[in-house]
Amino acid sequence: MSDLHNESIFITGGGSGLGLALVERFIEEGAQVATLELSAAKVASLRQRFGEHILAVEGNVTCYADYQRAVDQILTRSGKLDCFIGNAGIWDHNASLVNTPAETLETGFHELFNVNVLGYLLGAKACAPALISSEGSMIFTLSNAAWYPGGGGPLYTASKHAATGLIRQLAYELAPKVRVNGVGPCGMASDLRGPQALGQSETSIMQSLTPEKIAAILPLQFFPQPADFTGPYVMLASRRNNRALSGVMINADAGLAIRGIRHVAAGLDL
């Protein structure tokens, strides 16, 4: 039996991409899974696909009341909450400082930080009492942009660096009751969109990046799928497998940190 059997897991942005892969994986692990999802169509799809195995709540991660409504439903359904996974986010399609108009930069900043940073903070606030009670955990999705430049423009990169600070501070404030960690995936097949303020709300990440382009920059030389990143979340959520980690960011970057100066990888001819 899985360590996560009957554990109550709350994931934001579970309707597509990494969020959907996390929903699938935690259901496979036997967990009771809930998600807060902005898209009504994706909520309907989740309910149709997973039936009684999913509690799908339509709502916005920038709205505390929506979080509270979701947590109330989770506690009614499961009687507890063991892990909150803040995952919903938006990207800026590498919008640069020089090429972004000042007024767009300002509105884009507020929209992107509201989702990527405030959304995590509001989720933590809504989930904290239940997680303190269960001595559970929080996990936040980061990005390779939390470590390196070039994984987005200045707005996205700054938001992911801000999220690392949030993780450390929450890990400090909530210890010893709640473990707080992060996972930073690299580029993957995803429906990740951009801010409406930048005119990117209908543009997905795969319209800006090709599988070949992503694979070429990774030392492991493959195009990651969302399911490739779910393992670290499962480990961090498990009390048996993670008793000791808090304030830790797992850099799941397919080897970006070890790219060579002369070659992406030294073993390409092996």
Curated annotation (Swiss-Prot):
Supply the SUPFAM superfamilies for this chain: NAD(P)-binding Rossmann-fold domains
The answer on whether this UniProt entry bears the keyword Chaperone reads no
Q: Name one GO biological process term.
A: 3-phenylpropionate catabolic process
Signal peptide (from-to): none
Q: Which domain of life is it from?
A: Bacteria
Q: What is its EC number?
A: 1.3.1.87
Q: What keywords would UniProt list here? A: Aromatic hydrocarbons catabolism, NAD, Oxidoreductase
Instruction: Report if keyword Cell membrane is assigned.
Output: no
Positions bound to NAD(+): 10-34
The main enzyme category here is oxidoreductase
Which reactions does this protein catalyse? 3-(cis-5,6-dihydroxycyclohexa-1,3-dien-1-yl)propanoate + NAD(+) = 3-(2,3-dihydroxyphenyl)propanoate + NADH + H(+); (2E)-3-(cis-5,6-dihydroxycyclohexa-1,3-dien-1-yl)prop-2-enoate + NAD(+) = (2E)-3-(2,3-dihydroxyphenyl)prop-2-enoate + NADH + H(+)
Q: Which residues bind substrate?
A: S143
For molecular function, the Gene Ontology terms on record are: 2,3-dihydroxy-2,3-dihydro-phenylpropionate dehydrogenase activity
Describe its function: Converts 3-phenylpropionate-dihydrodiol (PP-dihydrodiol) and cinnamic acid-dihydrodiol (CI-dihydrodiol) into 3-(2,3-dihydroxylphenyl)propanoic acid (DHPP) and 2,3-dihydroxicinnamic acid (DHCI), respectively.
Question: What family is this protein classified in?
Answer: Belongs to the short-chain dehydrogenases/reductases (SDR) family.
Q: Which PANTHER family would you find in this protein's record?
A: 3-PHENYLPROPIONATE-DIHYDRODIOL_CINNAMIC ACID-DIHYDRODIOL DEHYDROGENASE, DEHYDROGENASE/REDUCTASE (SDR FAMILY) MEMBER 4
The protein's name in its UniProt record = 3-phenylpropionate-dihydrodiol/cinnamic acid-dihydrodiol dehydrogenase
Source organism phylogeny: Bacteria, Pseudomonadati, Pseudomonadota, Gammaproteobacteria, Enterobacterales
